[in-house]
Regions:
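N-terminal non-cleavable signal-anchor helices
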Residues: 8-13, 38, 52, 109, ...
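Oxidative protein folding and maturation machinery
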Residues: 96-306
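Bacterial Sec-dependent N-terminal signal peptides
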Residues: 1-24
Length: 306
C-alpha cells in the first residue's frame, strides 16, 4: 500500500510539472517607431501586430507553455533576449532602445536586459591583444555570474542562464580567434587557445533553444579551422569547417545550421568559383526548402554576374 501511494504521488507531481498553461505577454511600442518587432521562439519568427493608440502601439501574444523558455525580441536588426514562463505574464515597454518590464515575470527579464557593467564589444576581438582580451572576457563573465547568483531569481531560469553564459563566453573566446589580428601570416592568440576551444566544442542537443548555443558551436568550429589552416585561405578554412561539422555532430539541426551559415557566407563573399567540393556537402546536409531556395538563388545570381 505504501509503495502504491508513493507511485501515485510521483505521478501527480510529474503531471503538475508537465502541465501546460496559456500565458499572455504584452508589448508597448512608441508610435514614432517604424522598425518592425519580431518574436523568435522555438525556431519560428513571428512579426508582432501592433494596434496604434495616442502615444503607444500595443500588441500581445498568448503562448502555451509548460515551463520557462528563452526567446528573442528583434527590433529591426537588434535582438533582445527574453524569458517566457507559464503563469508568469509580463508587459514590456520599449523606451530608449531598451525593453522595460512589469508583471510577474519582470524580475528575470529585467535582469536579462540590464545594460550596466563592463561589456564585450566586437572591436575588442582585434583592438586589444588576445592576452588582454582573454582577461577582460573572464572578468566580464565572472561578474555576470556573480550578478546572476545575487539576483535571487527562479532556480529553473538560473540553471539555464548558467549554460547561456557559458555559451556566450565560448562564442567570445572563438570570436577572438576568428576576428583577431593576423600579423605576418600568424594569428595573435594565446598558445592555449586551441586546447581551450577543443574543450568546449561539445554538442548538447538539450541546449538547442538556449540563445548562443548554436552560434557558439559554429564560431568554435570556425576558430579551430583558422588555427589549423592558413587563415587567409578561405576555401581551405571552409572545407575544414564543413568536414569537422559533419564528422563530429549527430544533431542534424546543428549540422544543417553550421553548413548553411558558412556556405552562404562564403558564396556571398567569394562567389561560386571553386565550390565543386562544397556544393555536394551543402546538398547532403541542408534540406529546409527555404534555405535550399536561398542558396540556389544566390548561386544563380553569382553565375550570371561572372
Amino acid at each position: 500500500m505504501k509503495n502504491i501511494l508513493i507511485v501515485f504521488v510521483c505521478i501527480v507531481m510529474l503531471g503538475a510539472c508537465n502541465k501546460k498553461e496559456k500565458t499572455t505577454f504584452e508589448f508597448l511600442y512608441p508610435v514614432s517607431e517604424t522598425r518592425k518587432v519580431d518574436l523568435e521562439f522555438r525556431d519560428e519568427r513571428i512579426t508582432l501586430k501592433f494596434v496604434s493608440g495616442d502615444s503607444l502601439q500595443k500588441a500581445s501574444i498568448s503562448l502555451v507553455l509548460s515551463g520557462g523558455e528563452y526567446a528573442r525580441l528583434w527590433v529591426g536588426e537588434f535582438p533582445y533576449i527574453v524569458w517566457l514562463k507559464a503563469g508568469k505574464p509580463w508587459v514590456a515597454r520599449f523606451q530608449g532602445n531598451q525593453w522595460r518590464f512589469e508583471g510577474k515575470g519582470a524580475d528575470v527579464n529585467s535582469y536579462l536586459n540590464k545594460r550596466n557593467g563592463e561589456q564585450i564589444y566586437f572591436i575588442d576581438y582585434y583592438r586589444i591583444a588576445n592576452r588582454e582580451f582573454r582577461k577582460k572576457l573572464d572578468r566580464v563573465i565572472n561578474k555576470q555570474k556573480e550578478d546572476l547568483y545575487a539576483a535571487n531569481l527562479d532556480p529553473e531560469f538560473v540553471k539555464q542562464e548558467i549554460k547561456r553564459l557559458r555559451y556566450e563566453r565560448n562564442r567570445h573566446l572563438a570570436s577572438g580567434v576568428v576576428s583577431g589580428n593576423v600579423k605576418d601570416g600568424k594569428m595573435d592568440v594565446l598558445d592555449d587557445s586551441y586546447g581551450e576551444l577543443q574543450k568546449v566544442i561539445i554538442e548538447d542537443s538539450a541546449s538547442w533553444e538556449i540563445p548562443g548555443y548554436r552560434e557558439s558551436i559554429d564560431m568554435i568550429v570556425h576558430a579551430l579551422a583558422k588555427l589549423e589552416e592558413s587563415p587567409d585561405k578561405f576555401h581551405d578554412v571552409l572545407l575544414n569547417v564543413l568536414n569537422r561539422t559533419v564528422s563530429t555532430y549527430t544533431d542534424r539541426r546543428l549540422v544543417e545550421y553550421i553548413v548553411n551559415k558558412n556556405v552562404m557566407s562564403y558564396v556571398k563573399g567569394l562567389g561560386t568559383e571553386n565550390i565543386e567540393e562544397i556544393d555536394p556537402i551543402f546538398r547532403e546536409w541542408v534540406h529546409q526548402p527555404n534555405l535550399v531556395a536561398a542558396y540556389d538563388e544566390l548561386c544563380n545570381t553569382n553565375k550570371k554576374l561572372s
